[in-house]
From Swiss-Prot:
Organism: Bothrops mattogrossensis
The keyword Disulfide bond is assigned to this record: yes
One BP term from GO: arachidonate secretion
Name of the protein in question: Basic phospholipase A2 homolog BmatTX-II
Keywords: Disulfide bond, Myotoxin, Secreted, Toxin
Tissue expression summary: Expressed by the venom gland.
Domain of life the protein comes from: Eukaryota
InterPro entries, alphabetized: PLipase_A2_dom_sf
Amino acid sequence: SLFELGKMILQETGKNPAQSYGAYGCNC
């Protein structure tokens, strides 16, 4: 899910979810 994806990205980058999504783009 998006929530789980956000948690994974947050752990990998250690940055805010918004910044991570901006880098990854929309993984919809």
